[in-house]
Curated annotation (Swiss-Prot):
Residues 1-16 form the signal peptide. PROSITE patterns: PA2_ASP (PS00119), PA2_HIS (PS00118). This is Basic phospholipase A2 sistruxin B. Its cofactor is Ca(2+). It is found in: Secreted. Disulfide bonds join C42-C131, C44-C60, C59-C111, C65-C138, C66-C104, C73-C97, C91-C102. Binds 1 Ca(2+) ion. The active site is at H63, D105. It holds the Pfam family Phospholip_A2_1. It comes from Sistrurus tergeminus (Western massasauga). InterPro entries: PLipase_A2, PLipase_A2_Asp_AS, PLipase_A2_dom, PLipase_A2_dom_sf, PLipase_A2_His_AS. Ca(2+) binds at Y43, G45, G47, D64.
Length: 138
């Protein structure tokens, strides 16, 4: 499922939030979201279940939880204002939803940077079928 979604995003040429989130991830980690995070563990990419596999996957779990607190926002497609300078991501002004989505993405990108030292290439293309057990509460 995640693979189909990512391919669809690439084919459409998204100019919204997902592209912005990728830029934040690249800024913080020097890695492109695709392929390094799009299919990582049980929570990076579309959906998620089971227990996060490591600190990187936990960043994605927390990001999913953050989006989950914004049920009336278009978290995947809303375009928000932000800047990347002096080593920091700064979210700009916008609608309430845009500002909240930007903060979710900023916090996740910074979390991924902090988790770089424990990134495991074995989780890079992790099969959903290996994500077992109940999901944690947000």
């Amino acid at each position: 499922m995640r693979a189909l979604w990512i391919v669809a995003v690439l084919l459409v040429g998204v100019e919204g939030n997902l592209l912005q989130f990728n830029k934040m991830i690249k800024f913080e980690t020097n890695k492109n979201a695709i392929p390094f995070y799009a299919f990582y563990g049980c929570y990076c990419g579309w959906g998620g279940r089971g227990r996060p596999k490591d600190a990187t996957d936990r960043c994605c779990f927390v990001h999913d939880c953050c989006y989950g607190k914004l049920p009336n926002c278009d978290t995947k497609w809303d375009i928000y204002s932000y800047s990347l300078k002096s080593g920091f991501i700064t979210c700009g002004k916008g609608t309430w939803c845009e500002e909240q989505i930007c903060e979710c993405d900023r916090v996740a990108a910074e979390c991924l940077r902090r988790s770089l030292s424990t990134y495991k290439y074995g989780y890079m293309f992790y099969l959903d079928s290996r994500c077992k057990g109940p999901s944690e509460q947000c």
